[in-house]
Each structure stands twice: as C-alpha cells, then as structure tokens.
Amino acid sequence: MKLDLGSPPESGDLYNAFINALIIAGAGNGTIKLYSTAVRDFLDFINKDPRKVTSEDLNRWISSLLNREGKVKGDEVEKKRAKSVTIRYYIIAVRRFLKWINVSVRPPIPKVRRKEVKALDEIQIQKVLNACKRTKDKLIIRLLLDTGLRANELLSVLVKDIDLENNMIRVRNTKNGEERIVFFTDETKLLLRKYIKGKKAEDKLFDLKYDTLYRKLKRLGKKVGIDLRPHILRHTFATLSLKRGINVITLQKLLGHKDIKTTQIYTHLVLDDLRNEYLKAMSSSSSKTPP
C-alpha cells in the first residue's frame, strides 16, 4: 500500500494521528479497520511509548498472537491458515506504524503458504442450484457465480445499485475502496426482477449478516455433498471465466484485484486442468496405437 502519510507529530496521541493520516491519505475502509485494530492491539500489549519499543517487545507481542484462540470457521487446516494470514496482516500494519514514527526496530513478516484454490465444476454447480428451493437462495448462488463478488460486497448491494436494463450492478463497498461494475446473465435477471418487486431503492438486496449467509451456503452444500462457502463461488466464477475466454486483465477488473498476480493464480489452475486433459487424451490415444 503506497500512501503518503506525512510526518508524525512530535508529541501527543500517535495512534489517532496514524489513523487520521491513513484516512487523509485515502486508505480504504478495510485497511483503516485492520490497521486500527492491529496497532491498538500492539499498543495495549506493550503498554509503553511505542518510540521506545524493543525487539523483545515485538517478539513477545507476536508470541501472544500465536497463542490466542482463533474464531474462524472451518477445518483445522483452514483455521490454522486463517490465523497465520491474520497475524501476517497485523505485523504488516505495525511495521507501517513503526516506520511512520521513525522507529528502526521492525518485526519480520512471516510467509503464509498459498491456499489451495477450489472451484466447482459444471455438474456440481447444477447440483447446488437444484438444491435451492427458494428464489432467494437460487438468486444468491447465481449472483455469486455470475459476478464473482465477495460475500461482504454482495451483502452491501442496494436495490438502487442494480441496473436491470444493462444487466449490471454497481459495487460500492469494495475491499480496496474503489467502486466497480459487475454483470449478470439474463437468467439471473429474471430472478432479480421477481425478487426485488416491491422493494425500495434504498433497501438492501439481501438483508443478511455474513454468518447467516455462510451457514446458508454450508447447508445447501451439505444437501449435495459439497463443501460450499462464499469464496468457493468466487473461485468458480474466476476459473470458469478464464475457461470461457475472458482475458486475465478483464478478469482482474471484474474481481476487483489491485495486483494482477492475485488474478494469475486462476490462470495456473486453468493450465493445470488443460495439462491434465492433454495427458489424459494422449495416454488414451497411445494405448490404442499399435507398437
């Protein structure tokens, strides 16, 4: 994140000054929330002037983060990775704060093993859609598959953000703070038109909390034997988009990735599929060819 935060005050409340500097510099809401939480946690732990922090203070703080119980849902591997990612972001935030106040001590940034990208195939998608008995549930699945929206982005969509004439949605509450446009199919438009009938422009499209959405998808997935979570549908959108010919730069814009390297993870997944199909086909043909 390349933001000009200016210089810190010589005295006074460094924490609030840092957060205000982030806001003035145009940091996204997600960044501000993360940095404020991480730096507050760090300051509460060391309980001293941060300009006098030592390497020992930093090591004790990181150790305390590692020993805390996480609140992430999922299996043990998923929980462990999520915790590692959170700690990494906390450390990045505190490093930025310490650099801003001209403290030379820096905590090392731990590496996090890349998470395996899972996506549904066409058969699994149809199974999930068939398991939806309510228009609302089917619309949620279709929108996530059509748009690749993050769960929190979907839950922030208002009725007025939807353009039925042009099959598009204006996404305002994004991870990087930048608005973007996403699109949906005619089939999804029919569901949308039916679902929003009678709703006001300022109404939320789905008046749900993240936990409620998460549990809803898990229940739907359980019906058909699939581990269904919001981000798996985002991965599915990205993977299918590339397979259907959308170029990686366009996909980057649709997904709202600042760094194209994040988007390129999906190109590797598609290449793996192509390689497997090639090897399967060549193996089959060679077995039929006489020596």
Swiss-Prot record:
GO terms for cellular component: cytoplasm. Residues 9-102 form the Core-binding (CB) domain. GO terms for molecular function: DNA binding; site-specific recombinase activity; tyrosine-based site-specific recombinase activity. Pfam families: Phage_int_SAM_4, Phage_integrase. One of its GO terms (biological process) is DNA recombination. The active site is at residues 150, 175, 231, 234, 257, 266. It comes from the Archaea. This is Tyrosine recombinase XerA.
